[in-house]
Amino acid sequence: MAMKLNALMTLQCPKRNMFTRIAPPQAGRVRSKVSMASTLHASPLVFDKLKAGRPEVDELFNSLEGWARDNILVHLKSVENSWQPQDYLPDPTSDAFEDQVKEMRERAKDIPDEYFVVLVGDMITEEALPTYMSMLNRCDGIKDDTGAQPTSWATWTRAWTAEENRHGDLLNKYLYLSGRVDMRMIEKTIQYLIGSGMDTKTENCPYMGFIYTSFQERATFISHANTAKLAQHYGDKNLAQVCGNIASDEKRHATAYTKIVEKLAEIDPDTTVIAFSDMMRKKIQMPAHAMYDGSDDMLFKHFTAVAQQIGVYSAWDYCDIIDFLVDKWNVAKMTGLSGEGRKAQEYVCSLAAKIRRVEEKVQGKEKKAVLPVAFSWIFNRQIII
């Protein structure tokens, strides 16, 4: 971990076939996707630089109102031009409704349990939307003080939330009609997750907040895109379209958030790279890390292990996202940085390669132990991870 790499070096992640199982972590040692990110901590200077409540933060984001209107709000779709969940579900007003449900269940019956565990986990993550909206509304400079402010930042947050709301609605209804999952246990998990809240470690700082959302939206895009490919592989073209449309939304949202940080890096590269480094040192906390169904205290780790196992999202994707953001924000080419900024620059530019080396060593040394895990979402049927 102490080894330094050239800041301009970008390593490509080894490609993984999503239809081939990735070696899972050793039994009893299931790892979070981000567990190897860093053991270092940000210095006090970082927190001085990013201290919440600075008047300059409000001034900066107020000055970017017009820019956000012209460059960020364009990534939203009007309600009239948006797909809705009912577009992909059986029509309850039709005489053919029962036949449509039967056809849907017929397509779903041969899809493996592993896939449904991941699809349920993705849906539960989407359903905790109130938590994510509240995170953005706590950030200085962009918060929606009244709940209906007309600023570009507040407008974006509300409209983004409205678009995202369709994702959980559609997946929830699909899973309900599929007959493959225990909806009551899923509903309990959703209630537990929303009730537990989430600390993203963004400290109400918009720099950190937008770095977090840039990372998360791209991760979610990757996850839904891969569930779409798997659904196609299993022969359910309708489900593939469902997941594909959700992935398309996530990619569009990721583009907007990434563009915001790109603008911040142009205006204030020092603060931006320090914020980026700070978030990566603290490790990006996945939105559903507090997932709980009333019995499995390690539910999130078990869910993510299955996601990695079937090729939906893994440590390799985490590394690819870091490299993507480093490149998109031109981190390696930043100049005029403070001493703290240069340290942050060096850290983030070499991080993905370090994680890959550690992960390759871990996977190379781990015994191929198996762990049968019962998931309440699929009526306590066991999956080997």
Swiss-Prot record:
The protein's location, in the record's own words, is: Plastid, Chloroplast; Plastid
Provide a GO CC annotation, any one. chloroplast stroma
Binding, Fe cation 1: 126, 164, 167, 250
Q: Which domain of life is it from?
A: Eukaryota
Q: State the tissue distribution.
A: Found only in tissues which synthesize petroselinic acid, such as developing seeds.
> Matching Pfam families, A to Z?
FA_desaturase_2
Q: How does it assemble?
A: Homodimer.
Q: What is this protein called?
A: Palmitoyl-[acyl-carrier-protein] 4-desaturase, chloroplastic
